[in-house]
A protein has these predicted regions:
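Basic, polyanion-binding surface patches
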Residues: 1-145
């Protein structure tokens, strides 16, 4: 299972975003993990675009076919997850989208011993409107609770 939050932009009216409309209409979606080399393309695709705009083209990215879902994945993404929609929960003005991952796409050079090498992936994230990249990987000892 996987979940994402889709909410209105602070600078826009609280209408349904194209992302949420597309997921609800299609019943499926793709999550592409953004790594540092794709940061500018991610930022470009996060802007406000007309509903039928080609965001792949605007961001300089290549759509690639998926194996299970109809939606395209980002060819340049090091990790992509094809998902089937389980449900959407409205929480205030935000929506929690819950999906079941049905297919992973992972670049060979990132996959070691049955796991994704997060240090090589260099994933990006959002924290309170700012961006962050994973730089330090560490383990904590397992505890019995």
């Amino acid at each position: 299972m996987l979940c994402i939050s889709v909410g209105p932009r602070a600078d826009q009216p609280p209408d349904t975003k194209d992302t949420l409309s597309n997921i609800a209409e299609m019943g499926e979606f793709v999550i592409n993990i953004v790594s540092l080399p794709l940061s500018n393309a991610m930022y470009e695709s996060s802007g406000t675009h007309p509903p039928k705009a080609d965001e792949f083209e605007k961001a300089g990215l290549t759509p690639a076919p998926c194996e299970v879902v109809a939606a395209p994945r980002v060819e340049e993404a090091a990790v992509s997850m094809e998902c089937l929609l389980d449900r959407v929960l409205q929480l205030g003005t935000d929506h929690l989208v819950i999906g079941r991952i049905v297919r992973f796409h992972v670049r060979d050079e990132l996959y070691e011993n049955g796991r994704i090498d997060v240090a090589k992936l260099q994933p990006l994230g959002r924290l309170a409107g700012n961006y962050t990249k994973v730089e330090t990987i560490f383990e904590l000892p397992a505890e019995d609770f």
